[in-house]
Amino acid sequence: MAGGIVSPASLLDLIADIVEIPLNTGMFKKDCADLTRRVCLLTHLLEEIRDSTPIDSAASSSSENDWWSDLVVGLQAAKRLLSTARFQARDSSDGAAKRISFQFQCVTWKLEKALSNLPYDLYDISDEVGEQVELARSQLRRAMQRYGSLNSNKFSSALSEPMERDGFSNVIKIKAEEKLESVSETLHFGEEEEKQSSPPLRRSSSISLAYYLSKDADTDRLDKMVNKNTDESKKSDKLTIPVDFLCPVSLELMKDPVIVATGQTYERAYIQRWIDCGNLTCPKTQQKLENFTLTPNYVLRSLISRWCAEHNIEQPAGYINGRTKNSGDMSVIRALVQRLSSRSTEDRRNAVSEIRSLSKRSTDNRILIAEAGAIPVLVNLLTSEDVATQENAITCVLNLSIYENNKELIMFAGAVTSIVQVLRAGTMEARENAAATLFSLSLADENKIIIGGSGAIPALVDLLENGTPRGKKDAATALFNLCIYHGNKGRAVRAGIVTALVKMLSDSTRHRMVDEALTILSVLANNQDAKSAIVKANTLPALIGILQTDQTRNRENAAAILLSLCKRDTEKLITIGRLGAVVPLMDLSKNGTERGKRKAISLLELLRKACQ
């Protein structure tokens, strides 16, 4: 297997070693946890390859060897990085931070490259596992976008030397050093990394970064990024930035200054990470923070914007002319947010109703409402005993979650537990909006795990069975999204989702939900518990009946489910043959979509072998 390079079993052992590495408890906690979680997603892929036989053992093994080699390098690099990064203190030097930040980028890029070269045609990989691989790839790609791109052509030879403790100066020549420092600044402080900007890292490393790099990196994009960064760096080097404009944590010009409970001002991304790592004190004064509210410092932001304009320095996006969107709107919204904490039930009810209306109108309003600190207060109102307040609060959270950056703020506020409580015991309208909110939040891959473990799935299944038509739709979309993550499939089966879905296939009054039911079943069908439940519910005749309809998407999903159920099961293959599956499958193999044709052809081939 793997061209003699390595066996899947040995890589599974390597992943097990990675999982057992204690997580960093300092500034790298999230980076290490994210990388470990993404590596874990590869477990089922390697198990399936280990247990399967190559489709074409005579095929050339060059592509197979290449991807196995890339995967080995990436996983070994991940293990080394996680083993060393966990020892880093929060007060590590800025130079060390840039080096380890670059190493996280290299490991991320190498793993994504390996998965992009996976030779699907050489292995019998199920749709379920394929979806997990794509999930891991999408997470790695997003991480790469946050870190920035690599330029292996220009830096490969320079980076082949061990990295020195005091920075990059002993590694590359002056011109290359200038560019690499610019890259590191971009990797560390780019606009997209605000929520996950890389923290300080270890002081020394003998890891050769060229080990992670290859010649097909995004060179052109990097050049543009580096040149722009270098030009701006030259401008700022000639200026003395006012001390009050620098974040005390990063010592960088602040883009989004916020005030903490002690009155000190910090860059939002850095103080948020400081708090997320479990710190309870102000970094500068070491006083205990009475609360973790981050209040935007609009006066300082305006001064920074004006100073940037006067010195011809590019201003942070969104703050041009010293204003954030519309200052008048912001004043109104901040006043409404304050009223959310009023002692008067009626005042709270009216305020949340107005915020609901504003949050529905535009993206700008959703941004302003979040910046005004509304999200934690709205989350608290989800448990309000006043029905109208609770309904409006969950709808506000739903509307705010539409804006991508607000999703993380909602999760940070610990909203999931309260949303699930509304889903279980709220009014029908509140339950519907709670389900829709979980769907919106679950669009972020890492949230699927958190939501699945919160007890949301049984409540969603109950809404799927007993809700209004709209509630059923909201529950179905949320369940589909959550079940993409392998660990949630067993939870859904135990909650009785298969019974609910099968009823939708056979109940004529629910014909409008057939599409949703089939889509979810097609995702579940590769789970062993789900497979047993589907067969036990005598679903095969219903699936054959759907194959005979003219609904292309439904036929395609029915074929996918049948393929999962009947693979390696001669008895079931003979059964569906007797039920009349051959004729509609032949039609689908000729007239269906590409996916439908592929499923139909595979199923027909299995039927042919079963009848021999």
Curated annotation (Swiss-Prot):
Record-linked InterPro entries: ARM-like, ARM-type_fold, Armadillo, RING-Ubox_PUB, Ubox_domain, Znf_RING/FYVE/PHD
UniProt EC number: 2.3.2.27
Keyword Electron transport attached: no
PROSITE patterns, per database record: ARM_REPEAT, U_BOX
Gene3D superfamilies according to UniProt: Leucine-rich Repeat Variant, Zinc/RING finger domain, C3HC4 (zinc finger)
GO molecular function: ubiquitin-protein transferase activity
Coiled coil: 127-196
ARM repeat coordinates: 363-402, 404-443, 445-484, 486-526, 528-567
Enzyme class: transferase
Lineage, highest ranks first: Eukaryota, Viridiplantae, Streptophyta, Embryophyta, Tracheophyta
Pathway connected to this protein: Protein modification; protein ubiquitination
Domain U-box: 240-314
One Pfam family in the UniProt entry: PUB10_N
Phosphoprotein among keywords: no
Any Gene Ontology biological process: protein autoubiquitination
Keyword terms, alphabetized: Coiled coil, Repeat, Transferase, Ubl conjugation pathway
Catalytic activity: S-ubiquitinyl-[E2 ubiquitin-conjugating enzyme]-L-cysteine + [acceptor protein]-L-lysine = [E2 ubiquitin-conjugating enzyme]-L-cysteine + N(6)-ubiquitinyl-[acceptor protein]-L-lysine
Organism: Arabidopsis thaliana (Mouse-ear cress)
Protein name per the record: U-box domain-containing protein 11
Gene, per the UniProt record: PUB11
Domain of life: Eukaryota
Function recorded in the entry: Functions as an E3 ubiquitin ligase.
